[in-house]
Amino acid sequence: MTEDSYKKFIDIGFDDFKKFASDDSLSPNEKIGFPDSYRQGYDNHIIEDIESKLGEVRSGQEVLDIGPGCSNLAKAYIEKCYQSNSQITLVDSQEMLDLLPNMSNVIKVPGFYPSSDIMAKLNNEGGYDKIICYSVFHYLFIEANVWTFLDLTLNLLKPGGRFLLADIPNFSMRNRFFNSVKGAEFYNKFINSDKRNDNRKFDLHEDQIDDGVLIGMILRARNRGFHAYVMPQGDHLPMENRREDLLFVKP
């Protein structure tokens, strides 16, 4: 894909990803909104980072993956669950789910999370030991109610269960980084080599996630009786300098 082609990945949502899933001109990474350069060769590192926070999948555990997409990362995590003799439930559009393997340990639930019909199905499953939502929250932030999403997802955890809301683009973090010496060098090298990054303002658009959103979610979860943490990404991940994770634990 050319640089101009990536304009189609700006201001997108659930229905757009359904179309991407059916577009054979896109690679698996592009179908989920990523240039190949942002994901190729990183799958093992990402899984290691996930497991450092969620823990390794153990035999008999129930796992929920919200918005897995169709890339090799999703397939690798499904295989890891299979090898660990654990069941994984996948929630995404039918078009995306059709691109993922049908295996004995896989339950596919097509639809938009957290719609009422999806939640009715998931609430009948008895809860989950691990919930992962990777690189999806910034779309849900626009299309769903943040607090409803958080509350309903926390309700699905078993005692001792963990929910990792991961790979969140935090524009406060991004601005802090780009206004540092190292960040300015990164900006000039990878973002725009023709224009110096001299913006010292921490401007924020209404559809962007900042520190306030993430800290607010942490406080809400803690006030509901859950442990909650802001977690850095491993320095071997492609966007660790401007993305971070939230980890929620049910005592």
In which residue ranges do the predicted regions lie?
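C-terminal alpha-helical "lid/dimerization" subdomain adjacent to the S-adenosyl-L-methionine
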Residues: 169-221, 232-235
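Conserved beta-strand signature within the Rossmann-like core of class I S-adenosyl-L-methionine
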Residues: 160-168
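Conserved class I S-adenosyl-L-methionine
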Residues: 60-69
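Class I SAM-dependent methyltransferase Rossmann-like catalytic core
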Residues: 19-54
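N-terminal, positively charged/glycine-rich alpha-helical extensions of SAM-dependent methyltransferases
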Residues: 1-31
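A conserved beta-strand element that flanks and buttresses the S-adenosyl-L-methionine
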Residues: 132
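Class I SAM-dependent methyltransferase SAM/SAH-binding core
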Residues: 69-117
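A short, conserved alpha-helix within the catalytic core of class I
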Residues: 140-152
